Amino acid sequence: MKQILILDFGSQYTQLIARRLREEQIYCEILPFNTKYEDIIALDPAGVILSGGPSSVYGAGAPKPDPKIFSIDKPVLGICYGMQLLAVNGGGKVTACKKREYGFAEVKIKASTSKLLKGMPKKFTAWMSHGDGVHAMPKNFKVTATTSTSPFSAAEDDKNKRYAVQFHPEVVHTAHGSKILKNFARVICGYKEKWTPASIMTASIAAMKKQIGKGHVICGLSGGVDSSVVAALLAKAIGKNLYCIYVDTGLLRTGDRERTEGLAKKLKVNLKIVDAEKLFLTKLAGVTDPEKKRKIIGALFIEVFEKEAKKFKDAQFLAQGTLYPDVIESMSVKGPSDVIKSHHNVGGLPEKMNLKLVEPLRFLFKDEVRALGRELGLGSEIVDIHPFPGPGLAVRILGAVNKPDLDTLRAADFIVREELYKSGWDKKSWQAFAVLLPIKTVGVMGDERTYEKAACVRCVNSVDGMTADWTKLPYDVLQKISGRIISEVRGINKVVYDITSKPPSTIEWE
């Protein structure tokens, strides 16, 4: 399938460019800014987008693409920093702005014949985020839009198929921004194909059949949306040659195991369940540091999974639910970010086990995985399931983990999820759960004094988990959740609601 290529110069918004294009059923991929010209040509893109970035084009070490990119015989769109690169390369001028533009700006269209701004209102609000600005465009460019402080907000060179905007059409703050990106792909690049869940499914199954052939695949099935979609794709591609492994760590929620067993039965795939609760709780005994808990669980999970996987001696492949943001981050121009928390997966397994990787979701975002799941016929109980951390309930019990506290938290967490489902707020929230706090509070039940633990309810709205806002649940829903937990769950006598956003907080407490 044809694609639009996006060269990443370090913008925090680069992934949004891809998301906006894909929402318009336009397939695109993100590559590092320094990708070789020959590699780009080999992909035969319909067009190229130069992303924004935090650098100054004149700064020491500023990211620059392969020089031959500027003469590529394909349409090119420069966004913010990308526009400045096009300007400087063509003999234009970029200087520091007297007044930096950060935030909203009113854009006025100056050219009614603009292909890039076709169908846009004459005035619209756009999101600016730049300290440098273009103060002279190359001679072949004509100015198509301005703001009160930016005389070159958009410009075009139709003859050489070069287009540029100083604002960010990819962010939701820019009115009709998706239309600008759609115009670039559909009108300027002539992109005609439609990238849909059905086409994704067909292409993925065909690719896996070609890669795997008559081979056998091991898949770690957790019951979450990613691993479930991977298993469903593989079931269609190779059928009985798929071996699924479910490790019951004892740190899972009520219903997780049963849901996974039901999925395996529906898909008619082999499922091996490993009961490892005793092993995990023994290793976690007395451990209170959250990072140590994560590392113990991650290492032990790999150990258990590897031991079980080796029993399938005819397996040559390991399937993983790697998503596109992970791929992008691994090749990012920005380099390694600070590690806030260790991530739990089986990434170390293929090398140890001499297995080849199968990653059918590696070019998909989370919302696309959910759409693919629906196309595959997976139910809402799987496709719309809230994210659940790899270490499970261990990072929702603050302090040491033990079976009585796990049972208490499981009961409270089930009530939270059940009440949200009854009220319809499960669909309006991105993630919701209970946390067992390491404090005891005084209470009164009947005529007796109690001294028991407190629980916290956490419910957030988000798109991808990178940022999140706390969900404004109705008081009656909160009241039902609190009342049921106090009445039905032994060991809890107080319920609080977390109203912190991310940032500054994280979604999980540990």
Curated annotation (Swiss-Prot):
Domain of life the protein comes from: Bacteria
Annotated CDD domains: GATase1_GMP_Synthase (cd01742), GMP_synthase_C (cd01997)
Coiled coil: none
A molecular function (GO) term: GMP synthase activity
Encoding gene (name): guaA
Annotated Glutamine amidotransferase type-1 domain residues: 3-194
Function as written in the Swiss-Prot or TrEMBL entry: Catalyzes the synthesis of GMP from XMP.
Sequence ranges assigned to domain GMPS ATP-PPase in this UniProt record: 195-385
Leading EC class: ligase
A single GO cellular-component term on record: cytosol
Keyword Metal-binding attributed: no
Protein's pathway: Purine metabolism; GMP biosynthesis; GMP from XMP (L-Gln route): step 1/1
E.C. code: 6.3.5.2
Pfam families, per database record: GATase, GMP_synt_C, NAD_synthase
Annotated residues for binding of ATP: S222, G223, G224, V225, D226, S227, S228
Stored InterPro entries: Class_I_gatase-like, GATASE, GMP_synth_C, GMP_synth_GATase, GMP_synthase, GMPS_ATP_PPase_dom, NAD/GMP_synthase, Rossmann-like_a/b/a_fold
Entry annotation: catalytic residues: C80, H168, E170
Protein name: GMP synthase [glutamine-hydrolyzing]
Protein keywords: ATP-binding, Glutamine amidotransferase, GMP biosynthesis, Ligase, Nucleotide-binding, Purine biosynthesis
Subunit structure as annotated in this protein's UniProt entry: Homodimer.
